[in-house]
Structure formats: C-alpha cells, structure tokens
C-alpha cells in the first residue's frame, strides 16, 4: 500500500500533476551553510521539496529556516531513523552521483536489498528510490517493477 497520502497535500498534488520540483543539495553535502543557502534558494524558487543528506542535525538546521518538506537521502538504511525523528518528511535511497565519481555503481540487487532493509526499518515512512542510470534500460524497467512490488512510494530516474 502506498504511503503517498502521508506526504503534505501540496507534495501529493504536484506528484499527481507530474510537476513536483525537488531541489537536491547532495547526498554528501553536510556543510550546514551550503545546505541552508540551497534551502533558501529552493523556497524562493518555488520548490516543493528539499532533498538533503541524511543527518539529523542537518534536518533540524534546515527546518529552522524553511517550511519545505524535507527528504533525506542515503544508501545506509539505518541512517534514516534519526533523521526521520528530527523531522524528515520522507526518505530516499538515491542521489548516487557522488558514488559514480568514485567508480562505484549500484546493481539492481543492491538497490532492492537496500529497499527491503529500509522498508523493514521504517515501514510507515514514505520511501523514494532512484533507479540507477548505469543499468541498461531493460534492467531499469525490471528494477522499477520490482520496486513497485516492494511497496516503494516514489520511483525516480536519473538523467545523464
């Protein structure tokens, strides 16, 4: 069952209109000043969601300056717990770009494993998962279908 209905009304509306604007500060951007500056720009620019690195203190500092819903991104499911407690609205397995720069790629099986671990830890929190662009197109489609079966609420793709 989808948890989309747990997201703020505005986010739900924009998702259904296929026009959600999510600004990403970066999976590994833990610089509070940088993320706060991005958050301010996102709010001024009309963003619907701010996607930040998964760190509770970062969530708290960003929520001090914006009312935008916060999505936290990580590839270690255990990290999500404290960020959700700190106020993150939803969670995402994704923003893999910082790993690609290091030559690290995520397989479909790795993404599925991370998804299952995350759903086990936080079954009542909306979950977004990014399908890696490094997979062949047919493998991306297969993974997306498997993610739906796993109960993922939002599936994202990467553009390269």
Regions from the language model: what does each represent?
Residues 2-160:
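Alpha/beta enzyme core
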């Amino acid at each position: 069952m989808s948890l989309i209905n747990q997201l703020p009304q505005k986010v739900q509306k924009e998702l259904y209109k296929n026009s959600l604007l999510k600004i990403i500060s970066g999976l590994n951007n833990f610089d509070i000043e940088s993320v706060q500056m991005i958050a301010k720009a996102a709010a001024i620019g009309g963003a619907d969601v701010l996607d930040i690195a998964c760190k509770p203190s970062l969530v708290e500092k960003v929520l001090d300056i914006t009312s935008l819903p916060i999505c936290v991104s990580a590839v270690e499911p255990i990290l999500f717990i404290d960020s959700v407690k700190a106020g993150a609205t939803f969670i995402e397995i994704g923003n893999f770009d910082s790993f690609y720069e290091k030559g690290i790629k995520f397989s479909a099986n790795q993404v599925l494993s991370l998804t299952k671990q995350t759903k086990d830890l936080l079954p009542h929190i909306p979950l977004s998962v990014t399908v890696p662009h490094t997979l062949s197109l047919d493998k991306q489609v297969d993974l997306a279908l498997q993610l739906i079966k796993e109960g993922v609420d939002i599936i994202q793709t990467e553009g390269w």
